[in-house]
Structures are given as structure tokens and as C-alpha cells.
Amino acid sequence: MNSAQIKAMIEDEFEELVEIRRDLHMHPELSEHEERTEKAICAQLDKLGIAYEAGVAGHGIIATVGPKDAKYGIAIRADIDALPITECTGLPYASVNKGVMHACGHDIHTTVLLGAARIFKAMENELKGAVKLFFQPAEETVGGAERMIAHDGLNSPKIKRVMGMHVDPTVPTGCIHLAKSRMNASTTELIINVNGVACHGAHPDQGVDAIVVASHIVLALQTISSRFAAPTTPVIVTIGTIHGGSKENVCAGQVKLAGTIRALDFETRDFIKAHVKTIAENTAAAFGASAEVIMNDGYPPLVNDVATSLAIADVAEKEIGRGSVIFMDDPSLGADDFAYFTSKVPGVYFNIGTYKEGQALPQALHNENFAPDEECIKYGVLMNVLGALRLLDEDEAKA
């Protein structure tokens, strides 16, 4: 099947894919609770006669298309969970699950991969290797990608490269947006428990005010980026919550700070963590208090393989059109657990545009009015299919 035939098939399937997307959008489910979504995906795979394993890492599914004797293959991932947001779009297919919404486009991601599955199945005998389709749960919370990989998802057959995509409401429909290398940051959860000595507000000299101590710690942490890290190195230490004190006339004895650390590589992450601990503990000690620092590493940095990124960009330029590729000037300090895949095998994560000029509803991820242009589904399917075929061709040539 050539690219013209693939494009024609996408056009033929588009109306039904929109119906699938709207059904998923109407019935969003939170991380770890994607029961209906899992069943809906399985029903579509059953119609196509595609072999799969369900119940992976909770409600995830791994499907495989291609030669039964394939010794290697590529993987494509779509996340399937929704967010705890009450939808306000007023669309006829708006969420019927109160307080839950597909506000991050995972309904689009799932639909795109199901659309690609149809084409892969139609040309199964032409595939030069296996294509494994990862319908991944729990991206928004615990990182379902890591658990799917732990399920031995990247073997049987051996996966040589991996692809993933995300909708991007800042990019026009029909364009893709990606980084050649560094794409997203790592995350580390940060908790600092400041322990002072509570006392009456009229006699602050008789205690150690934990709120004052915590305030100095918060300010001092910002010097990590301005005075310790190189000016060209992106470093983020965010304190998102401060909890302390019980009464307006009492100097607090305890304060809890919570936030995140973000970096684009492990070396910088560890550098930040060391300085956070030193600053928090020594600042507290200077005031006669103590600080307990707890740091839990989350997602690793997401780094695209340069050769794979350039291959995908070339596919877009040739098949969507010149000017359809927008390379990122700088990496994003956001995070995505697709990084677990790219930390294991070379891969590429790219964004597909969902912004349509003159669209009535505002475009913003994690927003209660998020309403992406459904035309993006066509481009997502096209890039998944033609991108996978390009990578399989390249990997066969190297074999």
C-alpha cells in the first residue's frame, strides 16, 4: 500500500474515527479506572482481528500487528486516561461523567492509534516487522509506561524503536512540532518538613517560628537557578504548597513545603537535589530549627533520538507538505512518562497541531473548554502509519 492509498483509506475511515473519538470523549475515565475505555479499545481490535493482551499495568492493552515470525519491530504508544476536570464546552458529545474530562487529548491519541491499527492490519502482509500498539493507562498519575515496560512489553519481538505523539493546541492543524533531541524534563517530588518551636505570638523570642524559617528556605532555593547553575542550564525548583500554623496569634512550630524539581538531564537533577538538601537543612539550622528533606524521583528526562526525529520530520515534509514541521527552539520543562520508553530504546515523541483558525472555543490543555480540531486525527494517523513504515524500512536496511 503506497502513501496515496494510505491517505485515501484515512479519508474513508475518518467519519467512523470521529465517532470513536466522541464516544471516548463522552465517557472519560481517570487513571487506574479506565475499565470502559479498555473494553471499547478491545472491541475495536476484535473487529479488526488484531491479537492483543488486555489488563496490562492495570487497564492497558498491548496489540501486535505484522508477520508472525518477525524478529524485531517498532512500538507506538497512546495514553488513554482522563483528568479530574468538569467539562464546560457545551458540545453534544461532552463528558457525561461529572468531574472527569478528556482535557489533555488522550481520546484523540487513542483514536489515532486505533485508526493506525486499521491500516496496519489492512497491509499486514507488507509490513517488514512487527508493530506493537501500546494503549497505556495512568499517564496522568503513576506513570503507566514504566509498568507496561516492566511487563516485558518491549520484547517478543524485540522493539528497536518507539514512537509517541501528543496533541498541541498552540500548533496549527496539519503541522507537527518536535525536538531533535531534548524534549521534556525529569520530575522529582519535593517535600520539606520544617520543625521549629511553637510559641505565643506575643513572645516570639520563646520559640522558633517555622513560618519565618520556611519563608527563608523558599527564597534561598531560588538561588540554585540564579547563582549555582550555569545561566544556560534550565533549572526549576517550584514550591507549590505551604502548610503551617493553626492560629493567628501563635508562631507555628511546623511547616510543610511541597513542590517539584525539574531538569533536562540526570546530572543537573542530582546537582539540584544536592543543593536543595544543603540549603534547606542549613537555613533551618541557622534559625535554630531543623528541616527534613524528602525527594522522590518521578519521570526521567524525555530525549528524542536525533536520527529518528529527523526521519519523522522528513516523512511529514514529504507527505503533509513543506513547512509542516516546526522544530522546537527550546525543550519544554513539562514531563511525560513516554520518557520511560525512550530511556530503553531510541524513539521520538512529537506533537500534532489541533488549532484551527477562528475556532470558537479556547485552546488550552487541562482546560475545561478544551476542544481540539478533530481534523488532527487524520494527520495523527498518517504520521503514525508512515512514520512506522519509514522506521521499519530503515531498521531492515540495518539488519
Where are these regions (language model features)?
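Acidic/His- and Gly-rich active-site-bordering loop/insert found
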Residues: N2-H102, T111-L127
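Divalent metal-coordination and catalytic microenvironments
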Residues: L24, A63, I76, H106, ...
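Active-site beta-loop-alpha junctions enriched in small/polar residues
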Residues: E29, D79-D81, A138, D168, ...
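Histidine/acidic-residue-rich, glycine-tolerant segments that coordinate divalent metal ions
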Residues: I61, L83-I85, T89-M101, D107-I108, ...
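Structural motif
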Residues: Y72-A75, V131-K132, I159-M163, S324-V325, ...
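Non-cysteine beta-strand/loop elements that form the S-adenosyl-L-methionine
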Residues: A75-R77, L190-I192, Y349-T354
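Metal-dependent amide/peptide-bond hydrolase catalytic core
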Residues: S215-A399
